[in-house]
Every structure is written in structure tokens, then in C-alpha cells.
Design a protein with these regions (language model features):
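C-terminal ends of transmembrane helices
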Residues: 5-9, 77-92, 140-151, 194-204, ...
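Hydrophobic core segments of alpha-helical transmembrane domains in multi-pass membrane transport
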Residues: 21-34, 74-80, 110-112, 192-197, ...
Length: 437
């Protein structure tokens, strides 16, 4: 089972480590926003950066370059994860996927319904999509704090429903948080995506061509009214999952290259600092062979995951989490409370109750060594909306008061949900769960 377990372990370790960086960036943003440097810190993100080419100009504030540009890479990685999970991962088997699917649906619908119910007739109704999100990095980070007490099945369940939750968030952004649509740009962008899919289908994949085409699609979507990050998801779905060469071919060819390299080394009387041309050619061949052994999808996911986890998401949190904690007349405490409650209660009820019913009616089954109390704990962790909630917040509102009020609700709601989830899991877990080994 190592071929399944090892990638999952690597994913969890990466998400756990990144959650620490993400948390640190968020705390730093909150400290700066509530210090004497507040005006300079918050004002910095409003400075404009312009890219100007003959016949083309793109000018946006720093905050928009992060939220529309860098976050498109984040959504590209989400798209890669979704495609992998659906084709060969936990979501490829309907029986195994049924519980994460119903949990994710409940975890999206109930918070939105609760928010609309609580906020009926009050300012900020556009924010109904904010409590639907789950931050996979933070939720997995808290789960990993419990170490071997947590069964692997519970971690896989959390990963799976969080990925489906991300897919739901993408659809919500595409259909409900897009502005006036320019159909010419949309259709051209979709035509390019379709072309890339056809090229991928016929094994005509070129990372350089796909990269250039991806930038064109991003610009088209940016100027179309659909949020530019959707381009990242669509482009990810065109990346091939098939490998160019078999692992046995890699071994045989690799051995041949290494043997040639070794022969060149033996010709030298001593280990020289400078390699000869044949040795350099061998290194180039080995690098090309190594890249072809992993599928383009797996290669890109592996290469980009670290950048997203340790650079893009922390930078996003640093730019967006800064909010002045002032419960004065300027803060919409009702909106903040409603978002917070929807994340804590709505997520818990949606994930746990729907999962419980699915299990009782034999639609799904609990993962191995998982009990209902630990399922309840993970249901609370689903209320850690954080990065995705902050992202939707910026799309839902234009009023600074509503944006900041929602941020307070997101931060407090995520904190309480995370704490409740940790405590429930801490009490439900045994001192050492053998299934975690």
C-alpha cells in the first residue's frame, strides 16, 4: 500500500508545513494592520503596477495582481488535484467517493442557507458564498497536530471532501461572482482551452506552448467578466495524466546513460572540476528522461505545489488578512457574526448530519478506524474557511466596511471552528492508533 500511502503522506506534510507559514503571514498582517504602520501597510496594496506592450496595457493594484494573477496559479494546482483525484485517486471509485461527495455538498449548502437565513434583509447578502469554503492547508495542519492518534482514513476523507469543496467554490465563483460578461473574450478563451485539450488527447503536449496559451487565456478571462482564476482550473483540466515512457524503459535507458557517464569518468585520471561534453550530454539526457517518466500533470503538480504552499498562499494571506479590529460604528458586527456562525455551525451541521444520514442509509460507509466523534471533529475543521473565504469575500463586496467586517467573521469563525475540531478529535482519538502507521 506504500504507493498509495507515500504520496498522501507527502501531501499532508507539505500542507502541514505550509499552514505554519500561512498562519505566521496572517498574524503578521493583523499586527501590522493594527499598529502604527497600519496606513502604510494597507496603502501599499493599493499601489498600481503596469505592464505595457505595443498595443496592450494592463494596470492593476498590487492586491489585484495577487488575487487575480498569483491566485490563478493556486487554482491551476487545485484543477490538477481535482483531475488526479477523479481519474486515479480517492474520487475515482464511486463507493469510496460517496462519503466525501455528500459531506462536501452538505458542507457547501448548509452554511450558505444558514447565512441567508440569518442575514435576511440586512446588508451583505452577497456574501452567502463566503462560509461555503474550506481551507485544506489549515484543516490538515490541525489534524496533523494530533499525530498518530488520527487514522489515515480520516486524513484521506478530509483531503477528498476539501478538494470537492474547492471544486464547488470554483463553480460558485464562475457562476455567481462574475461581473458583466464579454462573450467574445469568453468564447475565444474556451476555444483555446478546447484546442489544448485536443492536442493533449493526441499526445501533442508542449509545456512551452501550453504556458503561452495559458497566459493568453488568463488575459482573455481577466477582460471577460469571468474571474481570471477560473482560467487556471480550465487549463489544468487540459494537462495530460498519461506518462510518455514506462518505468521499465526509464530504468533501462537510465542505466544505459549512467553506464556511459561512468565510462567517461573512468577515462579521467582524477575527478576533474569541469565535465567533458559527453558527460554534460549524459546529464541532459537523464534530465529529459526523468521529466518524461512522470506524467505532465504529476510533474506540474509536484513542481508547483511548494511554490503555492509557501509563497503564493502566504502572500495572499499577508495581503488580505490585514483588518483593523475596531468594533465601532464602522464595523458591521451582524455580518461578521453571521459569517462566523455559518462557518462554525453551518459547516458542522452540513458535513456531519449529511454524512451521518448517508452512513445510516447505507449510501456510504465510515472510513476504517473512524468513529462518529472523530467525524464530528473533522466536520468542525471544515469550518476553517480562511484563504478561500477571504478570496470569495473580495469578490462578493466592494464596500470596504463590508469587506473588513466579513474578514473579522472569517478569522473568528475559522479560529473557533478549528479549536472545536481539535478538541473533539483530541478527546475521541486513542493514544496511538495503529492505522496511522
Amino acid at each position: 500500500m506504500n504507493f498509495i500511502k507515500d504520496p498522501i503522506d507527502r501531501f499532508i506534510k507539505l500542507e502541514t508545513s505550509s499552514s505554519i507559514v500561512l498562519f505566521s503571514a496572517s498574524i503578521a498582517a493583523l499586527i501590522l494592520a493594527n499598529s502604527g504602520l497600519s496606513e502604510a501597510f494597507l496603502g501599499f496594496w493599493k499601489n498600481y503596477i503596469t505592464i505595457s506592450l505595443p498595443g496592450f496595457e494592463l494596470s492593476k493594484p498590487v492586491l489585484k495582481w495577487i488575487n487575480d494573477g498569483l491566485m490563478a496559479i493556486f487554482f491551476f494546482v487545485i484543477g490538477l488535484e481535482i483531475k488526479r483525484e477523479v481519474l486515479i485517486g480517492e474520487l475515482s471509485d464511486l463507493k469510496k467517493a460517496s462519503l466525501p461527495i455528500v459531506a462536501a455538498i452538505g458542507g457547501m449548502v448548509f452554511p450558505a442557507v444558514l447565512f441567508v437565513t440569518l442575514n435576511q434583509g440586512k446588508p451583505g447578502m452577497e456574501g452567502w458564498g463566503i462560509p461555503m469554503a474550506t481551507d485544506i492547508a489549515f484543516s490538515l495542519g490541525i489534524l496533523t497536530l494530533l499525530g498518530k492518534r488520527v487514522p489515515v482514513g480520516l486524513k484521506i476523507f478530509l483531503m477528498a471532501f476539501a478538494i470537492i469543496d474547492d471544486l464547488g467554490a470554483v463553480l460558485v465563483i464562475a457562476f455567481f461572482y462574475s461581473s458583466k460578461l464579454i462573450w467574445t473574450n469568453i468564447l475565444i478563451g474556451l476555444a483555446i482551452v478546447a484546442l489544448l485539450s485536443i492536442l493533449s488527447r493526441f499526445k501533442l503536449y508542449s509545456k512551452y506552448f501550453f504556458f503561452i496559451a495559458g497566459i493568453v487565456v488568463w488575459v482573455l478571462f481577466l477582460k471577460s467578466g469571468i474571474h481570471a482564476t477560473i482560467a487556471g482550473v480550465l487549463l489544468a483540466l487540459t494537462i495530460p495524466i498519461q506518462r510518455h515512457i514506462k518505468t521499465t524503459t526509464f530504468y533501462d535507458k537510465g542505466q544505459e546513460i549512467l553506464d556511459g557517464f561512468l565510462e567517461e569518468c573512468k577515462k579521467e585520471s582524477k575527478d576533474k572540476t569541469i565535465l567533458n561534453h559527453k558527460q554534460l550530454d549524459a546529464i541532459d539526457e537523464m534530465e529529459e528522461l526523468t521529466e518524461k517518466t512522470a506524467s505532465p500533470l504529476q510533474f506540474l503538480e509536484h513542481r508547483l505545489h511548494g511554490w503555492v504552499a509557501f509563497i503564493i498562499l502566504p502572500l495572499f494571506a499577508f495581503a488580505n488578512a490585514g483588518v483593523v479590529f475596531s468594533f465601532s460604528g464602522d464595523t458591521n458586527t451582524v455580518l461578521a457574526s453571521n459569517i462566523g456562525l455559518s462557518l462554525i455551525i453551518g459547516k458542522f451541521v452540513g458535513i456531519f448530519v449529511i454524512s451521518f444520514l448517508a452512513i445510516k442509509f447505507k449510501i456510504s460507509e465510515l472510513p476504517k478506524n473512524v468513529n462518529f466523534m472523530s467525524l464530528a471533529g473533522v466536520s468542525f475543521l471544515g469550518g476553517l474557511g480562511f484563504t478561500m473565504s477571504l478570496f470569495i469575500n473580495n469578490l462578493a463586496f466592494t464596500d470596504e466596511v463590508l469587506i473588513d467586517s466579513a474578514k473579522i467573521g472569517i478569522l473568528l469563525g475559522s479560529f473557533v471552528a478549528g479549536l472545536l475540531g481539535y478538541l473533539l478529535l483530541r478527546f475521541s482519538a486513542t493514544k496511538k492508533n495503529p492505522s496511522a502507521n
